[in-house]
Amino acid sequence: VETRRITVLSAGLGVPSSSRLLADQLAAAAERQLAAAGYAVHIETVELRDLAVDIANNFVTGYAAPALAEVIAGVEASDGIIAVSPVFSASYSGLFKSFIDVLDPKALEGKAVLLGATAGTDRHQMVLDFAMRPLFTYLRTRTANTAVFAGPQDWGSNDAGGSALSTRIERAAGEFAGLLQGAQPRQKPATLESLPFEQLLAGISGRP
């Protein structure tokens, strides 16, 4: 049985947070759909809030503390990423972006990604397509077409809102699972040979 490794990144700040709640539901739906397709699934959930100090220190020291280094290694070893951020000032949170910035620029290349966002008003739902998706496109990920936004009406006793959210989650998880079913083992990039500057110039000019 093939195994698919998924890292879930939740950038929620509260305990509990709506971002974590959405992340858990997305992960559970993806696990169900992959299991139905015959895959074993390993899920690692990361609360970025717990790494906030280590992330900040990494920027000024260039050193990743053991806990942060372990999470980075887990992300790099994953087949897929579920990334959920709260919305602040019409974009993803600073904590979320800071974690992405400490990763190697090629760490997410080729990985399947499922995006989610939460906010206190529906006015922020476009953040998925105007902020988060461009970020992951730049990082060359394979991002599910459907991203999931959850606002206040999607939680609590509103049955209609909860049903609509569940439908969006199942659709997005299905697309994500489809990307993971086609995932290939990630190959390390070929090591580039470092040549003397004079030799590089000679190659450009055609001289031996």
What are these regions (language model features)?
Residues 31-36, 137, 141, 174-185:
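Generic secondary-structure signature for well-ordered alpha-helical cores
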Residues 44-53, 138-156:
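Mobile beta-alpha loop/short-helix "lid" or hinge segments that flank ligand
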Residues 145-208:
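Glycine-rich phosphate/pyrophosphate-binding loop and the adjoining helix
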Residues 15-17, 122-125, 156-157:
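A generic structural signal for short coil/turn motifs at secondary-structure boundaries
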Residues 63-139:
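Helix-loop-strand module that forms the ligand-binding subsite of alpha/beta enzymes
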Residues 1-84, 90-97, 191-208:
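N-terminal beta1-alpha1-beta2 submodule of the flavodoxin-like/Rossmannoid cofactor-binding fold
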Residues 22-26, 128, 172:
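Hydrophobic alpha-helical membrane-association signature
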Residues 2-10, 112, 148-157:
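A short small-residue
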